[in-house]
């Protein structure tokens, strides 16, 4: 398995002319209901126009678009990376008195935060499907979809994890001035994803990102964890921001003129590789690790013909033609019996 890239490995990687400079690992399509505004056909066209070698789809709590994404991007000559953004509950929201004092009666409703998972292999994609289902089973009544960290551990094989941006569990704990909890959460993720965990850095010009970035980098370096640069893409271009903001208001039941509501920024768009290189010029290893992650993800979901049940047993040695003939005869028999029963009942 390839190890995460460190600063001292950068020169060898950047010298290879065949490697892309940057890979988007956090993209939400229109299948992120009331969050994303990128139809997958448009995403495929944008990937080609921007000459992306690979791109990941990480919709919120679902894989609705995974197969369409895989087929469209592969047909366009772009490597599709199957992923998922999951809300994870570390079950620690009441263990720290500082958090209870901060949130009061609302402490129980605070879920730890979002992480991104990327499928490295067929086993990893199978685990993504399990997690995408169970995320709706763990929550209690009236709670938002999320998954317990112990459940995440049960289905972690074959997956790469990114720690999330300002909405991630590590950054959220730092925003609440709970550094010990942030460290404990990071340590727990390291246990679950050894050699497959990256500390995520995002720069959308959001206050929460500015307040937590230095601490996140410090934590990563202190624990010898690799960094990765991402842009949480919700829409295509900055000009789409206002329309997307209205979409978020619909999702939250708010008005655009309200200030006290969840808002993104025009920076949550699908930026070019050059824009990302300029944005993270001071953290080249975080950019290089996007390419390394793409290289570690070598599986994509494939379509298959419908698998229909067999209505008649013809034995192990029967040919497909014999099976079809037997099923046709069985259908005719049941139709005749049904017709006879109706005629007898109604005269």
What would you call each of these model-derived segments?
Residues 1-347:
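Phosphodiester-processing cores and adjacent nucleic acid-binding clamps
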């Amino acid at each position: 398995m390839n190890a995460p890239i460190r600063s001292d490995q950068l020169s060898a990687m950047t010298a290879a002319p065949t490697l892309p400079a940057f890979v988007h690992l956090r993209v939400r399509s229109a299948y992120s209901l009331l969050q994303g505004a990128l139809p997958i056909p448009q995403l495929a066209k944008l990937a080609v126009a921007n000459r992306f070698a690979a791109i990941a789809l990480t919709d919120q709590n679902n894989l609705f678009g995974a197969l369409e994404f895989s087929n469209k991007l592969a047909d366009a000559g772009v490597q599709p990376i199957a992923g998922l953004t999951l809300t994870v509950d570390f079950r620690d929201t009441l263990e720290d008195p500082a958090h209870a004092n901060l949130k009061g009666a609302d402490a129980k409703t605070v879920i730890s935060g979002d992480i991104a998972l990327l499928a490295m292999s067929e086993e990893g994609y199978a685990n993504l499907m399990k997690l995408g289902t169970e995320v709706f089973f763990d929550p209690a009544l009236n709670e938002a979809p999320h998954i317990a960290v112990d459940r995440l551990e049960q289905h972690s094989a074959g997956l790469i994890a990114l720690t999330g941006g300002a909405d991630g569990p590590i950054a959220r704990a730092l925003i609440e001035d709970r550094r010990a909890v942030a460290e404990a959460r990071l340590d727990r993720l390291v246990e679950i994803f050894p050699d497959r965990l990256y500390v995520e850095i995002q720069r959308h010009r959001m206050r929460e990102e500015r307040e937590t970035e230095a601490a996140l980098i410090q934590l990563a370096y202190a624990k010898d964890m690799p960094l990765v640069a991402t842009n949480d893409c919700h829409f295509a271009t900055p000009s789409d921001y206002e329309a997307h903001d209205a979409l978020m208001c619909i999702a939250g039941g708010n008005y655009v003129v309200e200030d006290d509501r969840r808002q993104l920024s025009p920076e949550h768009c699908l930026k070019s590789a050059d824009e990302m290189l300029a944005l993270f010029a001071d953290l080249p290893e975080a950019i290089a690790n996007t390419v390394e992650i793409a290289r570690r993800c070598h599986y994509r979901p494939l379509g298959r013909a419908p698998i229909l049940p067999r209505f008649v047993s013809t034995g192990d040695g029967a040919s497909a033609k014999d099976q079809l003939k037997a099923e046709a005869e069985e259908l005719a028999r049941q139709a005749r019996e049904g017709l006879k029963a109706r005629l007898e009942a109604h005269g």
